């Protein structure tokens, strides 16, 4: 969202974004997938991270460590532009209607009542993301005036969340679990409420 705020939905046209640096090195593969997936919102040709130790650990957890190959930028690589993001200074952001680059600090919109909540998608529905949401909902109920849905990114993640009890926590709170497919992101299955805030 910070990149969208800075360069807009057309800022990436004809560009490949490569994310690197000390902050990027700490991100696990699902977090990196969220960022690279959102390159489409920037209009980017593609987005990449180095295939480093984090990638090796992820592939090992998937039983595919033997397929891992380190892929790092050349030491003398040249770039058209370098954009520095200080991850420690970022504040929570939210994309507002009607384009993904209409980005506002959460502090500007946190008092607005919402009628719809959508957790997940292929972009940010990793095990850790959904488990955190489930723990927030544990012992609580979705407000009667709110439609709350959750989409999980993969069958593997869905099964692990189910086995570990996180889907039950969400369902007990009144969250509707969607099928593993495209959905609310492209306006399928959760039509925004008239005059509502989603």
Language model features with spans:
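Fe-S-dependent hydro-lyases/dehydratases of central metabolism
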Residues: 1-198
